[in-house]
UniProtKB/Swiss-Prot annotation:
It is found in: Nucleus; Chromosome; Chromosome, Telomere; Cytoplasm. The modification N6-acetyllysine is found at K23, K32. It comes from Plasmodium falciparum (isolate 3D7). GO terms for cellular component: chromosome, telomeric region; cytoplasm; nucleus. Changing K32A: No effect on nuclease activity. The lineage of its organism: Eukaryota, Sar, Alveolata, Apicomplexa, Aconoidasida. Acetylated. Exists in both acetylated and unacetylated forms but predominantly in an acetylated form. Deacetylated by Sir2A. This is Endonuclease ALBA3. Its EC number is 3.1.-.-. Changing K76A: No effect on nuclease activity. InterPro entries: Alba-like_dom_sf, DNA/RNA-bd_Alba-like, UCP030333_Alba. GO terms for molecular function: DNA binding; metal ion binding; nuclease activity; RNA binding. The gene is ALBA3. Belongs to the histone-like Alba family.
Length: 107
């Protein structure tokens, strides 16, 4: 289910890039809002959560919370290495794709 490859820095509107500064619940709430939408933004049917290095566990935690609360379903997990120009090494990256759970109702 997972693959390893070199990745670029492209990011789409339905993407959440997590960091170590916030907890997984914070990013799970953002994902829920992306599925719900608001006056300024239309809802998405798919959300992509990515994490680099030590933030991979935060990305996994956020996706797990969303799946446990029937907000989204994990449809794809991809691992890769991110090459940084600043440091001369490759950094592990995880990308988790969730689609809106069929039972999810925006409140």
């Amino acid at each position: 289910m997972a693959s390893t490859e070199e990745v670029s820095q492209e990011r789409s509107e339905n993407s959440i890039q997590v960091s170590m500064t916030k907890k997984p619940t914070f990013y799970a709430r953002i994902g829920k809002r992306m599925f719900t939408g608001n006056e300024e933004k239309n809802p998405f049917d798919e959300v992509i959560i990515t994490g680099l290095g030590n933030a991979t566990k935060i990305a996994i935690g956020a996706a797990s919370i969303m799946e446990k609360e029937d907000i989204g379903q994990i449809v794809k997990v991809q691992t890769a290495y991110f090459s940084s120009d600043r440091i001369n090494r490759r950094i592990p990256k995880i990308t988790i794709v969730l689609k809106k759970h069929p039972d999810f109702v925006a409140n």
